[in-house]
Amino acid sequence: MKPPVSSVVLFTLAGMAFAIPKHGFDFVVGVDGDFKAAKAAAAAIKTSEDTHFIIFFPNGEYNLGTLTGDGNQLTKFNTSHVSFIGESMEGVTLFNSSIEESISKTATLQFNTADDIYMQDLTVQNKSTTCSENACRHVTIQQVGDKYVYKRVRLISGQDTYYTNKGGRTYWDGGEIRGTVDFICGDGDVFFEGTKLVPTRSAAVITAGKTTTEWGYVFNNAIIESQFNNYYLGRSWNHAKTVFLNTKMIATPEAAGWQNPINEVPIISAEYNSMNGNGQKLDLSGRRRAYTDKNGGSANLNPVLSDTEAAKYTLKNVLGGSDSWAPDKLTEQADAPSITQVGKSVKWADDENAICWAVFVNGKYHSNTTDTRIGLDGIAEGSKVYLRAANSMGGLGEKSNEIVTVAATDSSVTDTSAADTSTVDTSTVDSIPSSPGDSATVPGDTTVTPGDTTKVPGDTTIARIERGHYAEPNRKQPQHLYTIKGQRVIKGRKKVMRALYGK
């Protein structure tokens, strides 16, 4: 477990971008302790939007209900500025099995007083199927605060799967939500981008908004999949605002599209450019227009947005707010590194958009590092190694190339990709330097890093190796130099020298 560093976000000033300061995972569940310990550690450390506490979950199932839940297996998490990062959406599941049904006391994770929560690459599931006479409400996530971000997150339950309890702002990037009745319900401005929605029973209802904010639920480029073709897009809980833009409905809903309200009539229940699974526009002429509620209220609404009306539903308009929040920037991924074995280490280039790199050995999480190298001590010869870069919130990007480790010594070089080694000439090397100030004669001049294979046309300076470790820029260790005088040039040939380790 590591203390957070000064910042994990990319700052800009006068159009200039600054590199994201490095920051390793603060807590790896199963390595640094269980989720109960992670929860306590996050609460004990001062955090802010610039210093997220990052909890990483390697692939596996994590029973929060019995570990941190109350008598009904509800887990409260009230610390702001925390990232929940999984290894994969399919491989990581946080779950509970609430005993009594309820919308307010069954959540797998309940965020009552937390703001600025980031989740990526995991599944949250409430496995309970317990019902009362009238309902089977078992929540996965219940959130109250502002600035929630979900990237490639899957929620699985039945009724009331996802409960946005207060009027904050939330952004979904991809992901999937499964349920039966009102399985996305509550308040707030929530922008769903490319999210998959899966009604899991006949006559299912996707949304039930009780909107007090300006925009409500906005679905853009959503995909609806189901084995049932008689579901509904939503019903108003209280004055709901819900729009579906550019939605691909692989399973098509009831012709009316919307149900009458639970309590009060909706403000807006509308679609724009709805398509079937083949990308063909759906006929929306049968969509519901007239609504009445149990209090005698009524509304007559246009179920189809015009081009002008639809154009207003931008991410900036819906979630920007007075502080110009841009959550899509937080979900951007750092590039996959290109890794190479050099001697007894694996190396890669730095990336100013990565806060750290997660290391995987033989398909399993091994470690994380803010450095651009890892030693191979403890990693067996023949192991398969790959890396994934973490973005500003800790979320992992695509895999790097995978290498198979080979036997190496401090003086061996396994990276020959940088030059044509068929013309290597080290015939004029007098000696390998063994202490500062020693020199050797080489054919050429350049500056090289020990372990590299580099063209050599003259004087050469190499960095001294401290017991086999690289003395690289930004590493917190002394950097000593050897100077090697180049005295011969062989014309008409490519001259290559392998930079060798000092002893």
Model-derived regions: residue spans:
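Sec-dependent signal peptide recognition
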Residues: 2-10
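Hydrophobic h-region of N-terminal signal peptides that target proteins for export
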Residues: 11-19
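Sequence-level preference for short, compositionally simple segments enriched
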Residues: 20-345, 352-361, 369-405
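Disulfide-bonded cysteine-rich modules in secreted/extracellular proteins
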Residues: 339-341, 411, 415-416, 465
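Short strand-turn-strand beta-turns centered on an Asx-Gly dipeptide
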Residues: 362-363, 485
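Extracellular interdomain linker/stem segments of modular secreted and single-pass surface proteins
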Residues: 406-410
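C-terminal outer-membrane/trafficking sorting elements
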Residues: 438, 443-503
